[in-house]
Amino acid sequence: MTITVVLGAQWGDEGKGKLVDGQCRDAQLCARAAGGHNAGHEVRVSFHLLPSGLINPKWFYHSMNFIGSGVVFHVPSFFSELQELEDKGLVAVHDRILVSDRVNVLLDMHIAVDGLEERELGGIGPCYQASRARNGIKLTDVFHPELFEQKVRRLADGYQKRFGELFDYDIKAELARFDEYRETLKKYVVDGVSFMRSAQQSDMKIVIEGANALMLDIDYGSYPFVTSSSTTLAGIIGGLTLNPKNITEVVGVVKAYTTRVGSGAFKTEDTEEIGTKLQEIGREWGTSTGRRRRSYTDLVVVKYSNSINYYDSLNLTKLDILDTFETIKIAIAYKVDGEELDSYPADLDILERAEVVYHEMPGWQKPTTNAKTYYDLPKAAREYIEYIEKFVGVKVKYIGTGPDREAMIQRA
């Protein structure tokens, strides 16, 4: 048995799906541990809730996909994504996906509340809030209609008292939808703890796909501009009941430059020529949330990320996007009043006052897209990679050199 965990090391959209896709080609299980249908990932198909392993061409090897207990589960999105995959010709998708009975069910009610609280409209935050307040709804509750209705009405009553007439929600329509879903859902639902225990006792190759990224973690991200779940290795372990001793490799995925979506501190952001060039060449449009903010690589962030997730290796993605740059800048420190900070700060005032220290390296100005091995890369590209390795203290094992599935160099 081997377990490979793939985690985003920046603010998301690093390209985790491509590595997961490659790792899942001969895997027996691909799983997600946390997050919800707002965590977009794209290889050839845009995913949000489902694991990327569903596009594994070797489905006949009994490759299974699993949504773990830490996920918030929006049933309409689950069915619509499965239908989209089926429409695109992917085989046996309904037979290759299972869901833990302990996931929290994300209702349209949560989405309505999210809109009232002026956040993103996915309902992720209110669903996690309900869970922590112990009035959430587990997937197992759905199969007890009277209990399910009681819980939905109790939750709706609480929101009605809080928001009054602003709370526009059709509880009868929601309950009717679940009356339709109930029988169809049954085939996908398993005891998540038992399933993962059996998987870890087998000879399976297991690939775990992290949602979002470290800098969006509820505890260690750039708070408060974060998601509502744990995106760390600890969140993976808890969301899937993994035995930490069974983990073979933890891979941090790092884009060769830095992007983030939405509000929040982004010290290296470039809104001028470089940022525009990165956006145009890199096609920087988020799977879930649209336009991304761009900058050169911020190794302060990557090193901080490694201090929490302790990566065994890194996957550097989209190296080819830098092929035409004459000079490449790398953020290597933050300074306040001339003094270098030890790490990425939690204090937003300190972060606001911090100045970024850059290291400049010559670009390679040669195409990397045809490189099959590490030494096919231009020397300056290798020096860039090796600088990242030395600074972070983790080997760059996987290098993405283009959008194709095969455009990935793996070093020994």
Swiss-Prot record:
Keyword Flavoprotein among record annotations? no
Active-site residues are D13 (proton acceptor), H41 (proton donor)
Q: In which pathway does it act?
A: Purine metabolism; AMP biosynthesis via de novo pathway; AMP from IMP: step 1/2
Where IMP is bound, by residue?
D13, E14, G15, K16, N38, A39, G40, H41, R134, N212, T227, R291
Which EC number(s) does UniProt give?
Answer: 6.3.4.4
Q: Name one Pfam family in it.
A: Adenylsucc_synt
Please verify whether the record's keywords include Repressor. Answer: no
Ordered alphabetically, the record's keywords are:
Cytoplasm, GTP-binding, Ligase, Magnesium, Metal-binding, Nucleotide-binding, Purine biosynthesis
UniProt superkingdom:
Eukaryota
Names of required cofactors:
Mg(2+)
Task: Indicate which residues the UniProt annotation says bind substrate.
Answer: T287, S288, T289, G290, R291, R292, R293
Q: Tell me the compartments it is located in.
A: Cytoplasm
Give the residues the record marks as binding GTP: 12-18, 40-42, 293, 318-320, 400-402
Report the protein's function.
Answer: Plays an important role in the de novo pathway and in the salvage pathway of purine nucleotide biosynthesis. Catalyzes the first committed step in the biosynthesis of AMP from IMP.
- Tell me the protein's name: Adenylosuccinate synthetase
Q: Which organism is it from?
A: Fusarium vanettenii (strain ATCC MYA-4622 / CBS 123669 / FGSC 9596 / NRRL 45880 / 77-13-4)
- Taxonomic classification: Eukaryota, Fungi, Dikarya, Ascomycota, Pezizomycotina
